[in-house]
Amino acid sequence: LLMTVPHLKDKVKGMLYMTRYGDTTDIIRHGLTKIRDGSEAIINAPKFAQLLNVILLFGNYLNATGIKGGAYGFRISSINKLVDTKAADGTTLLHFVERTVTRCFPELEGFVDELSAATEACRVQLLDLKHDLSELKSANVHHKKILDRLHSENEENVEAPYSKLMLPFLNKATNELHRLTDQIQYTERVFNEAMRYYGEGPDPVRRSFTG
């Protein structure tokens, strides 16, 4: 009996799209919020900025006689190298920085709290959110075209249960996807602003705090 339903395959795909749509848009929306909050957190993190200055001083001291001495800054990703510089007893530069901050700059220890939102943002990839949104927009256009074709084939299809269910949903989704597109563009601007604030130029490949 089901096989006699016109355009059954297209209708089933449309229903599946509708059931998955809400979860996907929620993931995108929550992910964008985390990235925006994380970007704003690292811009408004004075203790973290001061900590970077301390690390820069250490780096310049260690490289005082080399070509890297007297640097005005360093890439954020270079912080990972603090564990690679070791003394004879195995103590890393990270250990030394930690002890120095605790002893001489205890007021900077709260930088971790400043970056709590950025920690959440590390779990989100902006490129993944953009990809998910692009797939939703393509699917929405596809199912709208199918619905238009059904209506052109037979005017009675306009009043069919599938059309009455899908048409309002697709129209609403179209507007919502436009808003999500605007939100992604705004989030990307905020993210790039945070990268530039720390001297990290916008990178089309790097769209997360872990990059």
Question: Where are the regions a protein language model picked out?
Answer:
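Extended alpha-helical domain cores of large, multidomain eukaryotic proteins
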Residues: 1-211
